């Protein structure tokens, strides 16, 4: 088949997951997008062919050196994590992409496929996938029928918090690299790599070149600042949102002659140059004048061994404006005392960030891509308000 030459100015578009509103079409110039993908592969340590003529030799070398990629995509391909990290990157290296045939996420079937297909890479979306995967490994091991996951070299995640405790649990089953990437459809921000030898902290990332933290007053923050700010990246900036000039102007801005993408996440820039992710500004809860980010509270609550999943929302309050309410599911639907859970959470975060109410449910609802369904959580919480 004759090769089709594409204009690098051609628009490539992927829709956002619609976590904080209606899905938006994010537009990239195809040439810039491909350059970004190849840079990402190099940053991940892969040998990237210089041109098409080198591709066949590169694939043969990867098979000879046991470096051929077999990527199992655990999350939906409609999501940037699944499409870009799970499919595009391995395909650019001539690798194999493994998909699941069943609807919904089944961790037992995922590990069975890993065992059967000898997958080297697994792509997921944070704890929403990783925690059930860990539970599946634990059950299999306890029943003396563990999965053979020796082929796995790396698990890659993006889009949802991936807690340090769950990472360590996965590493107890197999020594591999756990790559936690931070970004969105609007641009990449940073990453964190965890191994048995090098543990990591939850929500802490080394930032990519061209990333800034912009305070609400317009100051570009320096490492060690006590302020928080919006994360902006100049690494790969979309041309805009499809047919949405207003939102494009709000998200993609020029600062000091450089164009940045501001997807809406807030962070603190630590003294060592890393960032601690706080969460999406549109989900921020304002309680008694304090800004509280749901993701930070959720991760603190989930440190309790009996908590399986959690979402935190702000509910109307006459005294504080909003009060923090947590919707929690427990491991095997165990009965958990609300006050005990609040006191355990107090060990991790400041008192004003603690939930004023905890509501228990059999299942915390999430989108198929693992993203938080705050609309459902708020609706659930409303049922219990007097």
Predicted regions and their residues:
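Conserved beta-loop-beta connector loops within the AMP-binding
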Residues: 212-233, 271-272, 334-338, 372-373
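AMP-binding/adenylate-forming catalytic core of the ANL superfamily
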Residues: 115, 234, 239-240, 250, ...
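Conserved AMP-binding A3 loop
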Residues: 11-51
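Conserved AMP-binding/adenylation subdomain of ANL enzymes
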Residues: 34-74, 78-123, 136, 140-143
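AMP-binding/adenylate-forming catalytic domain of the ANL superfamily
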Residues: 347-371
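Gly/Ser/Thr-rich phosphate-binding loop
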Residues: 18, 92-95, 119-124, 134-200, ...
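Conserved S/T- and glycine-rich ATP-binding loop of Class I adenylate-forming
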Residues: 10, 16-19, 71, 77, ...
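Conserved pre-ATP/AMP-binding loop-to-beta segment of ANL
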Residues: 1-15, 21-22, 52, 60-71
